[in-house]
């Protein structure tokens, strides 16, 4: 669907009425946050209408947002995965054929079935969404087992037709402290990259990284490992270089590409947020996803809008956003943040 068609609603019908009548919009309203159940609202959005989705659903059994129909407080991990699979099946329908999903998710440990301990007493809900201990027993898991939520979800989505393209590690130098003494403290979360189709939009150049100076020098000499010269040596493998070496094994500086493809470990620290949302991911994380997955002027969807980070970054980068948030207080918070009020 051409982007110029996505400028507003074709009928003056509220989202609530649209859902009640089981009707679907033929166009999509931009730069808006719909308040309500994400699954029901997604069902009212048109097919093939957004370029990408960047989101972080509530993690399993970590906190209670005090809302009916909230995701994350299911009795079992299987129920949690089932509900998210329903949501992302609708996301896949709403995405354009060349669209991508960037899904941030973290794991949880099984508890003992009694009152558990929070990791940081000063921040009982977590500074940055890092997983804390469960209080309830988990079927199929022993107490203290890591449940494996991220991969349970990744495989479930793959089974519904998504292409699982990347497991990106979001590494943090300032993770939430953990007082455990029988395992390493965790400092990372997962970002799964899914695509709707085999071929999809991915601007690898927009997120390319500088190569190391030593790598550039090695390429200039046309050397690989222990090979001494850039020119071929009889009886030895052809040396690696990014261009044909000159006669004495040198190539021009101008022939050196100073960039390399971005690696799948992203070092991005969390940032303080003074709003009343406990699990806001950093703007830099969203920026990287949008650079690669959403063209300028494109539309990004976030069905778990929270504090509005996705919408804020999209607006700053010349993209449009469509958000969904269950809690009306967070919707108000997100609008203020996107407008620069926070």
Per-segment meaning from a language model:
Residues 2-341:
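Core catalytic lobe of class I
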């Amino acid at each position: 669907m051409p982007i110029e068609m996505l400028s507003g609603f074709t009928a003056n019908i509220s989202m609530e009425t649209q859902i009640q009548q089981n009707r679907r919009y033929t166009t999509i309203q931009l730069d808006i946050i719909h308040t309500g159940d994400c699954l029901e609202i997604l069902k009212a959005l048109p097919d093939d209408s957004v370029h990408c989705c960047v989101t972080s659903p509530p993690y399993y059994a970590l906190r209670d947002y005090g809302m009916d129909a909230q995701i994350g407080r299911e009795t079992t991990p299987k129920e949690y995965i089932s509900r998210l699979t329903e949501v992302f099946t609708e996301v896949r329908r709403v995405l354009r054929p060349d669209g991508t999903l960037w899904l941030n998710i973290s794991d949880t440990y099984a508890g003992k079935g009694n009152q558990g301990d929070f990791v940081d007493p000063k921040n009982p809900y977590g500074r940055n969404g890092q997983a804390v201990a469960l209080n309830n027993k988990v079927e199929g898991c022993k107490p203290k087992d890591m449940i494996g939520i991220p991969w349970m979800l990744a495989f479930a989505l793959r089974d519904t037709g998504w292409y699982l393209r990347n497991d990106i590690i979001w590494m943090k130098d300032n993770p939430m402290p953990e007082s455990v003494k029988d395992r390493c403290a965790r400092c990372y979360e997962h970002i799964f990259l899914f695509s709707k189709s085999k071929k999809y939009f991915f601007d690898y150049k927009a997120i390319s990284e500088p190569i190391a100076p030593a790598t550039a020098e090695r390429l200039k000499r046309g050397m690989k490992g222990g090979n001494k010269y850039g020119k071929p040596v009889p009886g030895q493998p052809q040396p690696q270089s990014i261009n044909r070496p000159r006669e004495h094994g040198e190539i021009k500086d101008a022939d050196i590409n100073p960039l390399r493809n971005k690696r799948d470990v992203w070092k991005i620290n969390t940032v303080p947020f003074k709003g009343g949302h406990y699990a806001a991911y950093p703007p830099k994380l969203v920026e990287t996803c949008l650079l690669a997955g959403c063209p300028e002027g494109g539309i990004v969807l976030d069905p778990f809008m929270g504090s509005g980070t996705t919408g804020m970054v999209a607006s700053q980068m010349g993209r449009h956003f469509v958000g969904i948030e269950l809690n009306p207080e967070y919707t108000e918070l997100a609008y203020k943040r996107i407008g620069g009020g926070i």
